[in-house]
């Protein structure tokens, strides 16, 4: 009986210490703005998390791992000469080893209406965080945007700099694809994180 009480006291003390440490963690911020991009009918993949490089600044990391507390993606599509569709897929690469995924690793075909690639979906390589379609019309709303807020997760890195080779498991990406080349799209990504 005394041993059980002692174990409970130790557990309660450990939880209290952990809570105290977590309340004093330094929250850092990273922002990435990407504007004036032409709609890509074959798709393009943008790396969102590898800009968090090693260093001592408020937008850098200490080691090879960060814990994202929350992150936000803001996307906007603008129809120029014809009505068009923009598709934005925000995803996490669970098995990344220093590369930027290709469009065909995420989608079955390079088409804005395509389903996800069944092989990588079956292997659970990617976690789709959000899949958003913006239909912009010249006779209606020619500019549309969407803001997506999500809780975070762990991101690992294989290096210190902002290159594809530094990507590790948990890296965050956005795929953009559309039905016409004449539209423009913008995105901004913000992550609030702590060193893990």
Swiss-Prot record:
UniProt: Ca(2+) 3 binding residues: 26, 56, 139
InterPro entries for this protein: Satellite_CP-like (IPR005597), Satellite_virus_coat (IPR010392), Satellite_virus_coat_sf (IPR037164), Viral_coat (IPR029053)
Binding site for Ca(2+) 2: 26, 56, 139
Recorded superkingdom: Viruses
Location in or out of the cell: Virion
Annotated SUPFAM superfamilies: Satellite viruses
Cofactor(s) the record lists: Ca(2+)
Region (RNA-binding): 1-19
Membrane spanning residue stretches: none
Annotated cofactor note: Binds 3 Ca(2+) ions per subunit.
Keyword terms, alphabetized: Calcium, Capsid protein, Metal-binding, RNA-binding, Virion
Keyword field contains Cytoplasm: no
GO molecular function, one term: metal ion binding
Pfam assignment, any one: TNV_CP
Predominant cellular place of this UniProt entry's protein: virion
Role, per record: Self-assembles to form an icosahedral capsid of 17 nm in diameter.
Protein name per Swiss-Prot or TrEMBL: Capsid protein
């Amino acid at each position: 009986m005394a041993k059980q009480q002692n174990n409970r006291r130790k557990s309660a003390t450990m939880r209290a210490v952990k809570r105290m440490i977590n309340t004093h963690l330094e929250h850092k911020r990273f922002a990435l703005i990407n504007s004036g991009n032409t709609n890509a009918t074959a798709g393009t993949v943008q790396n969102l998390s590898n800009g968090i490089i090693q260093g001592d600044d408020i937008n850098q990391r200490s080691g090879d791992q960060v814990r994202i507390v929350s992150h936000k993606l803001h996307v906007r599509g603008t129809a120029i000469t014809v009505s068009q569709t923009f598709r934005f897929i925000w995803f996490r690469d669970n098995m990344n080893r220093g590369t930027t995924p290709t469009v065909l690793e995420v989608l079955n075909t390079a088409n804005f209406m395509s389903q996800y690639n069944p092989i990588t979906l079956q292997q659970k390589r990617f976690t789709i965080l959000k899949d958003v379609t913006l239909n912009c019309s010249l006779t209606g709303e020619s500019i549309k945007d969407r803001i997506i807020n999500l809780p975070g997760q762990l991101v690992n890195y294989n290096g210190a700099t902002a290159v594809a080779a530094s990507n590790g498991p948990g890296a965050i990406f956005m795929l953009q694809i559309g039905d016409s080349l004449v539209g423009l799209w913008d995105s901004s990504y913000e992550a609030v994180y702590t060193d893990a």
